[in-house]
Amino acid sequence: MPRITSVKPQKRKERFNIFLDGKFAFGVDENILVKNHLKVGQILTGDQIEKLIKETILGKLLDQALRFLSYRPRSQKEVTIYLTQKIAKRENIKFREAKESPLIGAVVAKLKRYNYLDDHEFAKWLVNLRIKSASRGLSLIKWELIQKGVDRDIIESILSIHPNQTLIAKKAIEKKLKRWQGLSELDLKKKVYAYLASRGFDFETIKEVFAFLIKRR
């Protein structure tokens, strides 16, 4: 069975190269080195080597996922796709093959356990962001959440606390009104209906907003 003949630090902090029988075998993080008491002279079985390599890859994927999440909140689907792409590139395999890796589920489970990944919190964040900064209607926001893999029950529960679409639609249209000042009522109606529909507002909300604009003219 292979024997550890050398343990050398890498240029990267807290990483070490493990040499078996005089040849480089694999790299490990410091925590894995310490946890498994790896030292020169130690004999490793094939199963132990495989476990150490998997543990190291899992740790690296977890670090990459945490960096990915540090830029902004993500849905579970977004993180799963990201991890799949990383595995596909690392192992030089197709995306659909990488999707089957058990490492993805293991990383996602760890992220959820420590509350780094929560689709309910992600949905709340995205809804508030889209309403405040982009003035989008609920149907467009709902579509975006579905695309990001958020469960429909979560989507409905989050959207149900944002019932007043009229105020949001009025805010969205205000930016356009100066440009449309000289339009006839019919042309204004076409512009308002088309714009608000493209922002994801429903027909009744658009109708109410247009009536408000005409009354204010």
Regions found by a protein language model. Give the residues of each.
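An alpha-helical, amphipathic repeat domain used for nucleic-acid recognition
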Residues: 1-217
